[in-house]
Amino acid sequence: MTQYRHQNSRRRFLQRSILLSAGCSLPPLLAAQNRQVERIGLQLYTLREELSQDFDGTLARVAALGFQEMEFAGYYDRSAAEIKKALDDNGLSSPAAHIQMTAVRSDLQREIDFAAEIGQRYIVVPSIAASERSTDDYKRHAETLNRAGEKTQAAGIKMAYHNHSFEFERAGNRAHYDTLLEETAPELVDFELDLFWIAHAGVDPMPYLDGHPGRFSMLHVKDRDQFGRMTSVGSGTINFAEIFSQADTAGFKHFFIEHDNPGDGFASIARSIYTVRNVQF
């Protein structure tokens, strides 16, 4: 039964993606239900150049567009108190930040203290070095995440891992991503599913969302066009309504819009937040 449900989910996902890539609108029954994302977030890597030039002004413009939650990927030489004040001044919060695995290994307590002062609830490892991607490496990474999760738990913070496409490479019959999911403790480690990168790997997210309920507290809401390029949300082929509809099963709590290299960052996030606001599921 589980295999049949996963095959069915994959078939629906591919059918709807094909419709979207062909420029067709989805039938109302497929496209919309009656829920919407309540609090829309932004992964600030999208605006890294703007933040480096005008940190406070950039946050103000982001807030004016209607974003409410910020996920950091660097703090631009500011203290936790300065970050917290800038967020408060603009009516923003920051549930999460990307922290490199090297910092998790070497200076985790500092990262915990920094995150706690800002009010963050997740420390997210954004990637794994290319030199550390063997089967045994992934098992060690899972152990590292578990140990870190034990330490962060005491501060009310949870560890998480963010995917690219390389984690879906397989060793035998098992994807490396499966190793991370299956060898980390659900009470200690969550996952942030990047919708562009899982699509870029040619992998249907539905079996993961169905098969690992409650593990995916965060999403990177990103789009991919028919040529495989990253694009602003709403300009590509990913069926967000179908993915968002798995919120209760998957455990989605935070929806962070992102574009790695948007060109015009503010134009991109304006288009993207408009799209996400209008996704019904």
Feature roles, as predicted:
Residues 48-52, 71-82, 100-108, 130-136, ...:
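Acidic-and-aromatic substrate-binding clefts and catalytic sites of carbohydrate-active enzymes
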Residues 42, 62, 70, 87, ...:
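Conserved, mostly hydrophobic/aromatic
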Residues 69, 76, 101-190:
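Active-site acidic/histidine proton-transfer and metal-coordination neighborhood
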Residues 42-46, 72-74, 96-101, 125-128, ...:
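A cross-domain feature marking catalytic cores of carbohydrate-active enzymes
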Residues 2-24:
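N-terminal secretory signal peptides and thylakoid transit peptides that target proteins
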Residues 28-53, 60-61:
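C-terminal segment of N-terminal export signals and the immediately downstream linker at the start
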Residues 34-35, 59-64, 78-94, 107-120, ...:
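Acidic (Asp/Glu)-rich catalytic clusters
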Residues 70, 154-237, 244:
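Acidic/histidine-rich catalytic cores of soluble enzymes
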